[in-house]
Amino acid sequence: MASIGPATTTAVKLRSSIFNPQSSTLSPSQQCITFTKSLHSFPTATRHNVASGVRCMAAVGEAATETKARTRSKYEIETLTGWLLKQEMAGVIDAELTIVLSSISLACKQIASLVQRAGISNLTGIQGAVNIQGEDQKKLDVVSNEVFSSCLRSSGRTGIIASEEEDVPVAVEESYSGNYIVVFDPLDGSSNIDAAVSTGSIFGIYSPNDECIVDSDHDDESQLSAEEQRCVVNVCQPGDNLLAAGYCMYSSSVIFVLTIGKGVYAFTLDPMYGEFVLTSEKIQIPKAGKIYSFNEGNYKMWDDKLKKYMDDLKEPGESQKPYSSRYIGSLVGDFHRTLLYGGIYGYPRDAKSKNGKLRLLYECAPMSFIVEQAGGKGSDGHQRILDIQPTEIHQRVPLYIGSVEEVEKLEKYLA
């Protein structure tokens, strides 16, 4: 058996007496410093047998870093407001767009509260009127539209708004040169409200039209000149012109998903602070996914090519696994699941709805902008959604959106 030399014995005693986390009242960093200094009073052989002071400091440094990381993840949160200010400081967006987005987030908080209290506040059921699409307006549709419009007006940075619930675009400011154009669906999936199923708000923001200035001296605001009418019509821009887009989902938690053209970020409303807190960064949709989200109740009204596609998803052959079906009936809810898990969401044209049901300007285009920023694809079955030039505010188009491979697979069937 090998004998233990005096230097080694000294080293062992030194380690146990000085660098002992269990018995010492000093912090790990203080122990390490004391331990390292003590080495200089011993012979070289002793120092050689004692653990390296450099390794000691490295270990303490790593421990400190881990502790700091744990503390940061537990106590340091990044709110939507703080995140927007960082983007502004980095030059990604300007101060006016920051204000507009903050106003939209405020509207979403108010609508979230209304949705949660809908049954208590008697906001369920039908309003008794129909919107421009001929759909029965729910009470909460009307209230949500007022909330959204009011928040955007109060921002002082919004020139024109276009909503699902408004017949025509509305000029917000008397002079809207330099102010943003905001299109939105204040409450998507409102037919689900009575059953407490997920709903959401969708929005898109376009750049201001610097050539449009409304004359504030009009006695009758409804009488617009031909030039002013042209400015209002300029709301009809292709989705490729979008500066920002997002949606807010009102479900088991309230989630605000946003892109400003630099990736997709998700913020969750913390009920304790009343703030949207950053919870997901640079979201990427899977390239493929075995989930499809279609309303198969309309199957008989689809064309044969789409029927063939759907049949092959459900019965792909002996060597492949069939796709799973998930359908909520709320674009925001179905899209959010598709964004996270991959797959495809579709609302096709059929014998009853020649161009589908979803609106291009304030539903399909914003969602397609988001999915492309996440690495996915949005299509009408033949062309990119963001390339389509709207001809009217409430224009409808078929929508197929989700993982790139899944959307391209469908396009081959429809070609």
UniProtKB/Swiss-Prot annotation:
Disulfide bonds: 231-236
Chief location bin: plastid
Compartments, as annotated in UniProt: Plastid, Chloroplast
GO MF, one example: fructose 1,6-bisphosphate 1-phosphatase activity
Transit peptide: 1-57
Amino acids binding Mg(2+) 3: 185, 188, 363
Record-listed substrate binding positions: 188-191, 295, 327, 345, 347, 357
InterPro entries assigned to the protein according to its UniProt record, in alphabetical order: FBPase_C_dom (IPR044015), FBPase_class-1 (IPR000146), FBPase_N (IPR033391), FBPtase (IPR028343), Fructose_bisphosphatase_AS (IPR020548)
Cofactor binding, per record: Binds 3 Mg(2+) ions per subunit.
Keywords on record: Calvin cycle, Carbohydrate metabolism, Chloroplast, Disulfide bond, Hydrolase, Magnesium, Metal-binding, Plastid, Transit peptide
Record-listed Mg(2+) 1 binding positions: 135, 164
EC number per UniProt: 3.1.3.11
Protein origin, superkingdom: Eukaryota
Region ranges (Involved in light regulation): 207-232
Pfam families for the chain: FBPase (PF00316), FBPase_C (PF18913)
Swiss-Prot/TrEMBL induction comment: Light activation through pH changes, Mg(2+) levels and also by light-modulated reduction of essential disulfide groups via the ferredoxin-thioredoxin f system.
Cofactor(s) listed in the protein's UniProt record: Mg(2+)
Family: Belongs to the FBPase class 1 family.
Note from the entry: In plants there are two FBPase isozymes: one in the cytosol and the other in the chloroplast.
NCBIfam families, per database record: PRK09293.1-1
Protein name per its UniProtKB record: Fructose-1,6-bisphosphatase, chloroplastic
Species of origin: Spinacia oleracea
